[in-house]
């Protein structure tokens, strides 16, 4: 009885030390080759702005675009007319044509100011053709622009929250032309992993072959899995619906630290670990202060000249860093606690993480975006 209890306790302890492997569906791991969106772009005008449009003297293309649009509507602007408009803005319109997009389907669009308009709030986008890379028109956009920012100005002072020079129009474009599709015409489908990994490519292939489709899937490289599929659109839709819901044991993910060099943000996943190391971080600041000294002659009629001489002061301040020990950390909570103990700013932490990886103390892949 005691032996049975001992083995029960031992089995429980071993179970607690096992890292559970998560399972994900194939639809979350792969993309289907050829099933993707296509970028659309167009140039248009936003009208109805409350005095926050382009300054036409500095953006002549806005006036030219408005003149061309009016001429298409049968309105002739006299030659040499200097239109001082404040409620019109030239904009670029972007959208994505979804895969299998059909004629008459609505898509979202993004409107961005091209000139020096202060705000697009309250404006209306006039009919704008959206073209693809082949210079063909695939959609027409029009509607009221929704701007997420807010701002006000008076007496030379201004307050602004978020940006006002761009906005969105939900369902603001209508598809007028469809892209030809080759879906269903071939007996092979290429599944592309979102992250290249030889082991994951083999796992996805094995999972498909074990799920009643034996011999249909084979990995071609670290990103592509070739799958034999039935011919025809309806048959391939049913086949992919089954394949995409197959679960794959993804196991332990690669440890990764992502650094945004523009914003200074640092993001790391739960598999990041640290080895023991010692770190000293010092700061060097250089301050340059320049003032203009004006020297005038004492006698106004003595023929002297007023001379402006610059006076420059340069100061250098260096603060030494104390050598600090960073203990080995086996989980994310300990990693965060160890890095916070350094008291470094996010920008300093970026340099520290790079140095730790070079020294072999950071057990993770460092990616800078």
Curated annotation (Swiss-Prot):
Signal sequence range: 1-23
A Pfam family annotated for this UniProt entry: FlgI
BP GO annotations: bacterial-type flagellum-dependent cell motility
Entry keyword set: Bacterial flagellum, Periplasm, Signal
A cellular-component GO term for this protein: bacterial-type flagellum basal body, distal rod, P ring
Highest taxon listed in the record's lineage: Bacteria
GO molecular function: structural molecule activity
Subcellular location: Periplasm; Bacterial flagellum basal body
Function: Assembles around the rod to form the L-ring and probably protects the motor/basal body from shearing forces during rotation.
Oligomer status and interactors: The basal body constitutes a major portion of the flagellar organelle and consists of four rings (L,P,S, and M) mounted on a central rod.
Family: Belongs to the FlgI family.
NCBIfam families according to UniProt: PRK05303.1 (NF003676)
Record protein name field: Flagellar P-ring protein
Gene assigned in the entry: flgI
């Amino acid at each position: 009885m005691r032996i049975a209890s001992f083995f029960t306790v031992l089995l429980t302890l071993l179970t607690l030390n096992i890292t559970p492997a998560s399972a994900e569906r194939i639809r979350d791991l792969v993309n289907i080759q050829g099933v993707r969106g296509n970028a659309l772009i167009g140039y248009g005008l936003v009208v109805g702005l409350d005095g926050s449009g382009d300054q036409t003297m500095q953006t002549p293309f806005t006036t030219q675009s408005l003149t061309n649009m009016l001429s298409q509507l049968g309105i002739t602007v006299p030659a040499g007319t200097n239109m001082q408009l404040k409620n019109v803005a030239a904009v670029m319109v972007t959208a994505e044509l979804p895969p299998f997009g059909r004629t008459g389907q609505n898509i979202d669009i993004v409107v961005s100011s091209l000139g020096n308009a202060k705000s697009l709030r309250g404006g209306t986008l006039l009919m704008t053709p959206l073209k693809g890379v082949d210079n063909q028109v695939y959609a027409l956009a029009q509607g009221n622009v929704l701007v997420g920012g807010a701002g006000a100005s008076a007496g030379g002072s201004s307050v602004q929250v978020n940006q006002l020079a761009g906005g969105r129009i939900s369902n603001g474009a209508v598809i007028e032309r469809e892209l030809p599709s080759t879906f269903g015409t071939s007996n092979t489908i290429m599944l592309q992993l979102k992250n290249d990994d030889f082991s994951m490519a083999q796992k996805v292939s094995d999972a498909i072959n074990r799920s009643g489709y034996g011999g249909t899937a084979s990995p071609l490289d670290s990103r592509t899995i070739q799958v034999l599929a039935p011919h025809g659109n309806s048959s391939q839709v049913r086949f992919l619906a089954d394949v995409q819901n197959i679960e794959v044991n993804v196991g332990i993910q690669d440890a990764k630290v992502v650094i945004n060099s523009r914003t200074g943000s640092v993001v790391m996943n739960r598999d990041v670990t640290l080895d023991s190391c010692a770190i000293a971080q010092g700061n060097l600041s250089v301050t340059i202060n320049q003032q203009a000294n004006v020297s005038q002659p004492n006698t106004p009629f003595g023929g002297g000249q007023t001379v402006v001489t610059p006076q420059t002061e340069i100061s250098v301040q260096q603060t030494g860093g104390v050598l600090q020990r960073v203990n080995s950390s086996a989980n994310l909570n300990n990693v965060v606690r160890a890095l916070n103990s350094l008291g470094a700013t996010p920008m300093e932490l970026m340099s520290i993480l790079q140095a730790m990886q070079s020294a072999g103390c950071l057990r993770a892949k460092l990616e800078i975006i």
